[in-house]
């Protein structure tokens, strides 16, 4: 399943995503088993001596995986109750759980393979307003060939 998640920039966009090891879905809830590669570009410059997964990547991934597997075309309009609880480095395995509550709140929880919570929060969703803008293009402003 890894590598199947490509955004507007094809394979380059998928390089910014973790590998998907498994997916479970029940109702309006999804659980993704994920692993981030040792050479993933998301660690570039964050930080040279101690690579740490940026929090913004965790937010982005929750939105991308929810949208890809649910078919929901809405985009993120805001974030609430965001809490980062653990540093994540290259090669680590973790689970992302997403649950759609109410009509526009996506609750997410990242849990490390050792059971420790990594981060939690809520993404507020709204209808897509601009044609041609894809929420799975990472990093923002990145174009193919860069």
PLM regions: where:
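Hydrophobic residues in beta-strands and at strand termini
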Residues: 34-36, 84, 125
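Catalytic strand-loop segment that frames the active site of acyl-thioester-processing enzymes
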Residues: 11-51
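Hydrophobic beta-strand-centered segment that forms part of the acyl-chain substrate-binding groove
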Residues: 60-97
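Short solvent-exposed loop/turn micro-motifs enriched in small/polar/acidic residues
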Residues: 14-16, 75, 91, 103
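Polybasic, low-complexity association/targeting segments
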Residues: 1-15
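HotDog/MaoC-like acyl-thioester-processing domains
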Residues: 18-19, 25-30, 99-146
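Residues that act as N-cap/strand-start positions at coil-to-secondary-structure junctions
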Residues: 17, 90-94, 117
């Amino acid at each position: 399943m890894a590598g199947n998640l490509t955004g507007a920039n094809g394979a380059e966009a998928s390089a910014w995503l973790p590998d998907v090891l498994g997916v479970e879905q029940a109702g309006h809830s999804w659980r993704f088993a994920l692993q981030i590669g040792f050479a993933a570009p998301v660690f570039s410059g964050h930080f040279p001596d101690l690579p740490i997964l940026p929090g913004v990547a965790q937010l982005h991934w929750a939105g991308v995986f929810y949208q890809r597997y649910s078919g929901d075309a809405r985009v993120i309009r805001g974030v609430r109750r965001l809490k980062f609880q653990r540093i994540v480095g290259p090669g680590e395995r973790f689970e992302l759980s997403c649950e759609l509550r109410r009509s526009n709140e996506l609750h997410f929880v990242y849990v490390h393979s050792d059971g420790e919570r990594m981060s939690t929060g809520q993404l507020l969703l709204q209808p897509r307003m601009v044609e041609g803008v894809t929420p799975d293009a990472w990093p923002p402003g990145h174009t193919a060939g860069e």
